[in-house]
């Protein structure tokens, strides 16, 4: 009997041992299982939306797409970064042939010219795509030359998978951007659930409205580091909101630090966003020290150090190679000189708000808050050459005003709760301020000082999409209990219609 019992027990022991070994892997996926189904639905919708846009927009008609593709090509084919200090180098012969086959020079910035359509043009493009010309360029990547390398390193994977076919490479790279768009919607949902824990349905409405934004889908359906920047920014928003609501744990501090570090490695614009993120770490440090003792100051410090590591390593590398310590960012210090500071403040103010008495006129004949930031947010696609007629922008003021009114009503109804959360709201305001000042300062340097185009593109504000989702969610709650479901449904239908009409506008532009 003892032998029989041992024989029966031994398989059971092995099963228990194997299940015990499987537990760590299950624990690793436990956070994913806790994500609500609604969050995955929002992410899937954002993915499908961006993938649809990636198919609608012709090759290399995404903003600066040829430059970003050249950056990836430089990494893979030359094994180095495009950093020779020039932004006007030549693409590879193969990329030039494909661009010529697409008639890119005629189509870009020229709405009167549509994309290629005849059979002869299609055959010429196919021949150019399979010409087998050199893939080595001048070592530059146009406007993308100065950007950090992380996004482009990730895009090297689809580039290698479809090697030898630029058009297929581009499409696969666009789909990677669509995945980043899905991550943006996912983290936006999680952020809204943290700041509105008692209104999960409102969080769903806000995240869905973000997932269906045509500007997000257009940028995520293009080869552009903005797509990854939006996802990273949404993740940082979520980590900050979770820290303010539940406290900063060691795991959350590491995640927040990694998010900041990835942001620095994704795009230079994250510098402005990071200002608010570090303000958030400072506020959390003060709060945690008061509530649980100074020992917990180590957690915000840990997040800050992890986040700053890429900047420190980049500065050390440049010092060792006798470059500017912070690369292009080093030149920004001249804007803070006493003689320039007032002009900078005046320009940045007028970049977003009406001019005050005594300020120099920088935007004569323009109401920047309407003509640039609102009208171009309604629709600005392609190489800033595809937009709606002005009457559409004026009509869009009515639903925008309605959403703003409902948002204010919802905020006023919860003013006591908001007052208790002023430190957290102040951090989000610091993120907004840091990003606005960075964009405005960069535009001042380009426009006012060097007489180049201004950085007047609403896409630069899309890292703030989680806050837009919060506006939508509070607007729906502002409609009151009775009308909130109808308001939420109407909002989703409105945004979805906006997305579809925007797609039709792009189709008419390139294929009409």
Regions found by a protein language model. Give the residues of each.
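Short acidic/glycine- and proline-prone juxtamembrane loop motifs at membrane-interface regions
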Residues: 215-229
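Membrane-interface transmembrane helices that cradle and orient dolichyl/undecaprenyl
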Residues: 196, 236-252, 285
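Interfacial juxtamembrane loops and adjacent helix segments
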Residues: 77-173, 338, 370-387
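Hydrophobic, aromatic-rich transmembrane alpha-helices
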Residues: 367-425, 429, 472
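Transmembrane-helix signature of polytopic, membrane-embedded enzymes
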Residues: 161, 167, 188-212
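Membrane-interface alpha helices of multi-pass inner-membrane proteins
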Residues: 252-268, 273-274, 306-309
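Perimembrane helix-loop-helix junctions
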Residues: 239, 245, 273-308, 316, ...
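Transmembrane-helix motifs of polytopic, lipid-linked glycan transferases
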Residues: 171-196, 235
């Amino acid at each position: 009997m003892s032998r029989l019992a041992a024989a029966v027990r031994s398989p059971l022991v092995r099963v228990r041992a194997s299940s015990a070994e499987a537990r760590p892997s299950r624990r690793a996926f436990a956070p994913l299982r806790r994500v609500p189904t609604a969050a995955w639905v929002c992410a899937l919708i954002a993915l499908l939306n961006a993938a649809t846009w990636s198919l609608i927009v012709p090759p290399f008609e995404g903003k600066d797409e040829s430059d970003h593709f050249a950056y990836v090509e430089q990494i893979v084919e030359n094994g180095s970064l495009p950093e020779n200090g020039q932004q006007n180098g030549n693409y590879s012969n193969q990329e030039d042939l494909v661009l010529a086959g697409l008639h890119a020079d005629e189509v870009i910035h020229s709405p009167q010219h549509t994309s290629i359509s005849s059979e002869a043009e299609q055959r010429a493009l196919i021949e150019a795509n399979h010409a087998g010309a050199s893939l080595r360029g001048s070592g530059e990547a146009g406007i993308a030359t100065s950007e950090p390398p992380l996004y482009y390193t990730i895009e090297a994977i689809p580039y290698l998978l479809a090697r030898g076919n630029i058009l297929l490479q581009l499409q696969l790279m666009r789909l990677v951007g669509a995945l980043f768009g899905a991550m943006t919607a996912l983290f936006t949902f999680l952020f809204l659930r943290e700041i509105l824990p008692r209104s999960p349905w409102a969080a769903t409405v806000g995240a869905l409205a973000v997932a269906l934004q045509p500007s997000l889908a257009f940028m995520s359906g293009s080869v552009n580091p903005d797509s990854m920047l939006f996802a990273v920014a949404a993740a940082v928003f979520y980590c900050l909101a979770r820290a303010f609501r539940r406290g900063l744990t060691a795991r959350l501090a590491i995640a927040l630090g990694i998010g900041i570090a990835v942001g620095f490695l994704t795009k230079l614009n994250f510098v402005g966003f990071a200002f608010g993120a570090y303000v958030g770490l400072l506020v959390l440090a003060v709060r945690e020290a008061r509530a649980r003792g100074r020992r917990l100051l180590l957690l915000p410090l840990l997040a800050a150090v992890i986040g700053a590591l890429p900047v420190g390593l980049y500065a050390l590398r440049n010092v060792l190679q006798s470059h500017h310590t912070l690369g292009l960012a080093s030149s920004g210090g001249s804007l803070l000189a006493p003689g320039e500071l007032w002009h900078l403040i005046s320009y940045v103010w007028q970049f977003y708000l009406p001019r005050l008495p005594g300020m120099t006129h920088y935007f004569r004949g323009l109401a920047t808050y309407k003509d640039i930031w609102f009208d171009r947010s309604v629709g600005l696609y392609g190489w800033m050459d595809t937009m709606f007629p002005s009457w559409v922008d004026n009509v869009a003021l009515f639903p925008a005003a309605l959403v703003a009114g409902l948002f204010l009503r919802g905020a006023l109804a919860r003013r006591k709760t908001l007052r208790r959360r002023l430190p957290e709201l102040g951090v989000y305001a610091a993120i907004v301020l840091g990003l606005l000042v960075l964009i405005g300062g960069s535009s001042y340097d380009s426009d006012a000082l060097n007489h180049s185009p201004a950085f007047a593109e609403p896409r630069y504000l899309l890292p703030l999409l989680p806050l837009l989702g919060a506006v939508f969610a509070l607007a729906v709650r502002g409609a009151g209990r009775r009308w909130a479901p109808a308001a939420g449904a109407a909002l989703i239908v409105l945004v979805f219609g906006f997305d579809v009409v925007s797609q039709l506008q792009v189709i008419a532009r390139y294929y009409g």
